[in-house]
Swiss-Prot record:
NCBIfam families: lipid_A_lpxD (TIGR01853), PRK00892.1 (NF002060). Its EC number is 2.3.1.191. One of its GO terms (cellular component) is membrane. Belongs to the transferase hexapeptide repeat family. LpxD subfamily. It catalyses: a UDP-3-O-[(3R)-3-hydroxyacyl]-alpha-D-glucosamine + a (3R)-hydroxyacyl-[ACP] = a UDP-2-N,3-O-bis[(3R)-3-hydroxyacyl]-alpha-D-glucosamine + holo-[ACP] + H(+). This is UDP-3-O-acylglucosamine N-acyltransferase. The gene is lpxD. The active site is at residue 253.
Length: 360
């Protein structure tokens, strides 16, 4: 379905520079777009691509349009303060227009306990299991093999992709998106040591601590494929509104993730950690348990966080990749730091003795 720039602006705002009747039916990158496609400029370093793009129209910020000057002549633009966000909203619209409607109803192979409550407008796919006391609200879509445990609520308009498991006693807010293979509400990693003795004489075992809390997820949360969120030991693990979690993320029991925080793939967050609002956690970050990150904290990829970071800012502890030979030389220096320290101390002592400086 093609829409004019005028129609897009009526729906999403912005101002038109060029032909308001220019039609676009899809989106593409600046360097690949053709007539009938909408591109966007989010990074000024690609400004030169706007001059050569074949796109029918370009989403652009006012300051970047000014930089184009005469090169903008004859081209079509939607001018908006945030072209990237505008692009995302238009992309969502095109996806919705192209998606075939799913008819409400329950697939014959689904298993639904009589004590569960499923809205008439819900879409329940093949081999879905819904246990007693579960509530499936209006417009929910549960794809094949989804499991919803007893007493769990899935909020209105949510979409759970195939093979998602939501254990008992959890709550997922409205408009959530949970991708394939995610597990919500599995037991937290809680074991009490019951050992006697030391070393080889040590005897005893680990005693499992029942995890009697749940998981509470706010509205507009998205959870990536194969991500796991553990239930709380006593109180709930909490994911606040509009949190976005990538694939293969582990969130331990009793954590609280603040609203509008984003967490990239393979991050691991140990139990009882609190992350503030509007934080950004990079890929493969590891965060120790029982620490607190304040609002607006950014932790870069592969960093390890072992203590609280209460102040907003950017934090890094990862070592960036370097040439292998350079790495070996650096590693050799690190191994010899103790010797170098001792040599420097000896030199300082000798120099102080020559000066008669007994305080050194």
């Amino acid at each position: 379905m093609a829409l004019t720039l005028e129609e897009l602006v009526k729906r999403f705002g912005g101002e038109i520079a060029g032909d308001a009747q220019c039609k676009v039916a899809g989106l593409a990158p600046l360097d690949q777009a053709g007539p009938g496609q909408l591109a966007f400029l989010a990074n000024p370093k690609y400004l030169s691509q706007v001059e050569t793009t074949g796109a029918g129209a370009v989403l652009i910020a006012p300051k970047d349009l000014e930089k184009l000057g005469a090169a903008a002549s004859g081209r079509n633009f939607i001018v908006t303060p945030n072209p990237y966000a505008y692009f995302a909203r238009v992309a969502q619209m095109f996806i919705d227009l192209a998606a075939p409607p799913r008819a409400a109803g329950v697939h014959p192979s689904a298993t639904i306990d009589p004590a569960a409550r499923v809205a008439d407008s819900a879409v329940i796919g093949p081999h879905v299991t819904i246990e007693a006391g579960a509530v499936i609200e209006d417009g929910v879509q549960l794809d094949a093999n989804v499991f919803v445990g007893r007493g769990t609520t899935i909020g209105a308009g949510s979409h759970l992709y195939p093979n998602v498991a939501v254990y008992h006693g959890c709550k997922i807010g409205p408009r959530a998106i949970v991708h394939a293979g995610a597990v919500i509400g599995s037991d937290g990693f809680g074991f009490a040591p019951d050992f006697v003795g030391d070393g080889e004489a040590r005897t005893g075992t680990w005693v499992k601590i029942p995890q009697v809390g749940g998981v509470s997820i706010g509205p507009d949360v998205e959870i990536g494929a194969n991500t796991t969120i553990d239930r709380g030991a006593m109180a709930d693990t909490v994911i606040e509104e509009c949190v976005k979690i990538d694939n293969q993320v582990q969130i331990g029991h009793n954590c609280r993730i603040g609203a509008y925080t984003v967490i990239a793939g393979c991050a691991g967050i140990a139990g009882s950690t609190t992350i503030g609002r509007h934080c950004m956690i990079g890929g493969a970050v590891g965060i120790a348990g029982h620490v607190t990150l304040g609002d607006y904290v950014i932790v870069t990829a592969k960093s390890g966080v072992s203590k609280s970071l209460p102040k907003a800012g950017i934090y890094t502890s990862a070592f960036p990749a370097v040439d292998h030979g350079e790495w070996n030389r650096s590693a050799a220096l690190v191994r010899n730091l103790d010797k170098l320290r001792d040599r420097i101390k000896a030199l300082e002592t000798a120099l102080a003795a020559q000066r008669g400086d007994t305080d050194a």
